[in-house]
Amino acid sequence: GVPIVPETAVVELIEREGIDLAVFAYSDVPHSRVMHLASQCLAAGADFTMLSGRHTMLTSSKPVVAVTAVRTGVGKSQTTRYLAKLLREKGLRVVAVRHPMPYGDLAAQAVQRFAAYADLDRYECTIEEREEYEPHIDAGCVVYAGVDYERILRQAETEADVILWDGGNNDLPFYRPDLHVCLVDPLRPGDERRYHPGEANVRMADLVIVNKCDAARPEDIDAVEASVREMNPLAQIHRCDSPVTVEGGAAVEGKDVIVVEDGPTLTHGSMTFGAGVVGASAARVSRIVDPSPYAVGSLAATYAKYPNACGVLPAMGYSSEQIRDLEATIEATPADAIVSGTPIDLTRVLTVSKPIVRASYELREREPGRLRAALDAVLG
């Protein structure tokens, strides 16, 4: 196979192997960082390039609706679920295909199909993977993922009328969309122009959703919308809310709680809070306890690398060791209960003594019916 080396070794690798071309191929990175890396490669003697969707996207025999974003944690998954519901209401068979999360044995993960919770265990899914697949399973939607996206597409086409691309990070779609929906975040105004390849998604999109309008300042909503209109004047722009509900919120009213949030949203997404904090506030908890002073093992390293996450607990669970560190940190933190803002049922993967209540969130259109009309215009 192709050897994997740290990015810090790129200059040495170019010089040692006489590399002619370096290709930048990952996502959710500030434009400035991309160009600093480009400068290193150019100085070492290699050309530097990025690949466009025209050269990377696969074409499906079925209609494709793609959901992407400008940053991690904007609300792609809830939007994908909402669109899947609208498509099913049209009597269409919908299959979601999720952007890859390649951990473990990649050959064994070439094509993965998830239709039941047992499939999550069979494929030994990480917490991050479960966060993406569980909500689809709960909604009765089959979801595919893996490594070989040509094989995945051809298998998904056998049981779908419509393919729903559920994007990861702020990456480009792997499949050529008939309708490209991109989400922007008014809680991070300006990021729609600052991150690669999120800006490309905005410029490519047929329809842009300004999400979380219920939590953002009106001036930031207006600024983000104006920014989108300047970059892509032909795109439809829809404003949506992301209301948070807490199941069993009365159980944590007046209590000291730990808030567990979606890991990627806090790490490379750079957020300081998520649905858990919003839900905890709505449930009138007494106090959100900062778990970072009690973090052990890999979680202590996570806080050191991402200090913005201090105050809440990122649900890092890419290995059994990280899950044990998560459990130990929860047990060591002096709190009465846990408010979970992750999309999964933590009780399925964690064993802790503190009770857990879930904060969940869904997409809500400010002008109901517009997304259905956009689907109808493409699919009939």
Task: Pin down the residues of each PLM region.
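Flexible phosphate-sensing "switch/lid" loops adjacent to ATP/NTP-binding sites
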Residues: 15-17, 65-68, 78, 85-229, ...
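Short beta->alpha connector loops at strand-helix junctions that form conserved
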Residues: 25, 52, 211, 360-361
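"Short basic amphipathic alpha-helical interaction patches in structured regions
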Residues: 36-38, 80-83
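Conserved glycine(s) of the Walker
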Residues: 74-75
